Amino acid sequence: MITIALFLVLLYFHDQLGYSAAQLQFGFYSETCPSAESIVRDVVQQAVTNDPGKAAVLLRLQFHDCFVEGCDGSILIKHGGNDDERFAAGNAGVAGFDVIDEAKSELERFCPGVVSCADIVALAARDAIAEAKGPFYEVPTGRRDGLIANVDHAKNLPDVQDSINTLKSKFREKGLSDQDLVLLSAGAHTIGTTACFFVIPRLDAQDPTINPEFFQILRSKCPQGGDVNVRIPLDWDSQFVFDNQIFQNIKNGRGVILSDSVLYQDNNMKKIIDSYLETNQSSKANFAADFTKAMIKMGAIGVKIGAEGEIRRLCSATN
């Protein structure tokens, strides 16, 4: 596990993020619930031990939460119908709700009504990354839980079929840079799997961004007319380990989903990806450090603080 120096993260956080984000604090629960972060960490560690795939699941959960209504735990709400945010087409396959619910249940035993579900999502993503041998970083906390979860609000999520210009636009709308796009999209895919449902559309014809040999591998794993729910690794060589191999795969035409592959067709994105390609420790450390910054930046999107929102008693329902 790579540990990122706290003072560097603090410096970046205060220099780069906006006013509302700066209201988040490192150690927000140090007095009201001192064991909050360790409780979440214990639950995540057990979940990833039982199923290593949970690491990527929890990382993806924070991404999808933050891109709709901001990082407010709105994706967790389940009213009972199909109009909730979690049922949006762009959230297909999003999971990890059970881990968040378990962490919340434990926190309510020790510190009832104190720790927000939005913060649990952010902490769980951090701990999941660390469990996958990725960087451990301090997470600013103090988010409050949102009150709105509407499927219509999730229509503009980044999609695996998006063009490079569309991806850039969607990230910029959230205050995220091209580098953040590379890190939070392709970089985050260093761990985890995807369903054949998202791959098969690329295989109708020979996609020029796919290595011909890899094209045949993908077609054998995700044949036309086959089970679209079959899952395959996003990082073909190390799906459970946080490393920079995903960038080499993309360069070599072994990107599994289109939204990863198209990044290398853009000159600016290509330069960013190439900067993380070296096998030396410095390059790997730079990727880990930059990924940490991008996660903290994303984790501050649209946060609710102070008297905004609420602290839910159950993560799946508003109070």
UniProtKB/Swiss-Prot annotation:
**EC number of the protein:** 1.11.1.7
| Cofactor(s) the protein requires to work | heme b; Ca(2+)
One short Pfam family name for this protein? Answer: peroxidase
- Asked whether the UniProt record includes Calcium among its keywords, one would answer yes
Any idea which GO molecular function terms this record carries? heme binding; lactoperoxidase activity; metal ion binding
Q: Where do transmembrane segments lie in this chain? A: none
For the site labelled Transition state stabilizer, the residues are: 60
What is the active site of this protein?
64
- Provide the residue positions that the database annotates as binding Ca(2+) 1: 65, 68, 70, 72, 74
Q: Mention any one GO cellular component term assigned to this protein in its UniProt record.
A: extracellular region
Residue positions with a glycan: 280
Q: Which InterPro entries match?
A: Haem_peroxidase, Haem_peroxidase_sf, Peroxidase_pln, Peroxidases_AS, Secretory_peroxidase
Cofactor-binding details, from the entry: Binds 1 heme b (iron(II)-protoporphyrin IX) group per subunit. Binds 2 calcium ions per subunit.
User: Gene3D superfamilies from the xrefs?
Assistant: 1.10.520.10, Peroxidase, domain 2
UniProt keyword annotations, A-Z: Calcium, Disulfide bond, Glycoprotein, Heme, Hydrogen peroxide, Iron, Metal-binding, Oxidoreductase, Peroxidase, Secreted, Signal
**Which residues hold heme b?**
189
Q: List the disulfide bonds.
A: 33-111, 66-71, 117-315, 196-222
Annotated signal sequence is 1-22
UniProt keyword annotation of rRNA-binding present: no
- List, in alphabetical order, the GO biological process terms annotated in this UniProt record: hydrogen peroxide catabolic process; response to oxidative stress
Q: Which reaction does it catalyse?
A: 2 a phenolic donor + H2O2 = 2 a phenolic radical donor + 2 H2O
**Top-rank taxon:** Eukaryota
Give the family, as the similarity comment puts it. Answer: Belongs to the peroxidase family. Classical plant (class III) peroxidase subfamily.
- Further notes on this entry? There are 73 peroxidase genes in A.thaliana.
Q: What does this protein do?
A: Removal of H(2)O(2), oxidation of toxic reductants, biosynthesis and degradation of lignin, suberization, auxin catabolism, response to environmental stresses such as wounding, pathogen attack and oxidative stress. These functions might be dependent on each isozyme/isoform in each plant tissue.
> What is the name of this protein?
Peroxidase 13
Instruction: Say which species the protein is native to.
Output: Arabidopsis thaliana
